[in-house]
């Protein structure tokens, strides 16, 4: 693992790279203006070793047109001292940038993890698609020798949606991201509920209780089957 990541190591075009001597971000400047508790501020200071602006994905560098809202995607490396990620502060900063710029500036975090890196994004709520509150999504770990971060889309709005999809769903499709996230999260929740009901059913001794749990299991299994078919159908349409 190199001492420092660069935009090109991540698969981003060299034209988007911020020069190393200009990319360092002071911690104080990062959380200044955020409404965070003293405890969160201390956690942020203690957990983060350094912050570096690696790249700026904008129309003037890439030639990709601005989106309806999105004009810039800042790619920020968050180098940790240990394994704990101060997710609450990273979410607050991304939310703050989003609100202050009227959704024009988004943040893609890149977090080195020893053997590769993870990405993280803040995604706003979208109640109509089943996302009831905005939150930070963190990807699985990626190796540096793979394809890296991909810029996909006809404008920066789609590029942002694709980056969110790469982070939350492990694919680059920019279509129906919130809907697909909501389906994936519902599947995960129902899968956990299915396992809980199976365990409870195996332990139950009374016939009435076993029948009740079996009926609940059938309902959960039916919904899981429906959602998984919907997820597959959506993937085929978007592919």
Sequence positions of predicted segments:
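Short, charged, amphipathic alpha-helical segments
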Residues: 207-218
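Amphipathic alpha-helical coiled-coil segments
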Residues: 219-239
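N-terminal/domain-start segments enriched in small and hydrophobic, helix-friendly residues
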Residues: 1-7, 11, 18-19, 25, ...
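Extended assembly-interface/linker segments at domain junctions
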Residues: 86-172
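Short, charge/polar-rich alpha-helical segments
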Residues: 170-187
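Non-transmembrane amphipathic alpha-helical segments
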Residues: 183, 187-204, 220, 224-227
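Peripheral peptide segments
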Residues: 129-130, 182, 232-235
């Amino acid at each position: 693992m190199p001492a420092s990541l660069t935009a090109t190591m991540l698969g981003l075009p060299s034209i988007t790279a911020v020069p190393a001597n200009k990319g360092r971000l002071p911690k104080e400047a990062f959380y200044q203006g955020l409404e965070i508790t003293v405890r969160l501020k201390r956690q942020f200071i203690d957990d983060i070793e350094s912050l570096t602006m690696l790249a700026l994905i904008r129309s003037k560098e890439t030639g990709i047109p601005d989106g309806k809202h999105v004009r810039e995607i800042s790619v920020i490396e968050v180098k940790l001292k240990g394994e704990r990620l101060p997710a609450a502060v990273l979410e607050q900063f991304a939310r703050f940038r989003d609100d202050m710029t009227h959704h024009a500036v988004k943040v893609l975090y890149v977090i080195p993890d020893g053997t590769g890196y993870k990405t993280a994004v803040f995604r706003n709520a979208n109640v109509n698609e089943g996302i009831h509150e905005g939150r930070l999504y963190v990807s699985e770990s990626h190796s540096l020798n793979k394809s890296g971060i991909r810029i996909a889309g006809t404008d920066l709005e789609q590029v942002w949606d694709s980056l969110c999809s790469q982070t939350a769903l492990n694919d680059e499709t920019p279509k129906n991201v919130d809907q697909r996230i909501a389906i994936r999260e519902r599947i995960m929740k129902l899968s956990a509920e299915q396992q809980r009901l199976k365990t409870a059913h195996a332990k139950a001794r009374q016939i009435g209780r076993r029948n009740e749990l079996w009926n609940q299991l059938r309902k959960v299994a039916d919904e899981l089957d429906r959602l998984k078919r919907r997820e597959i159908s959506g993937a085929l349409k978007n592919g």
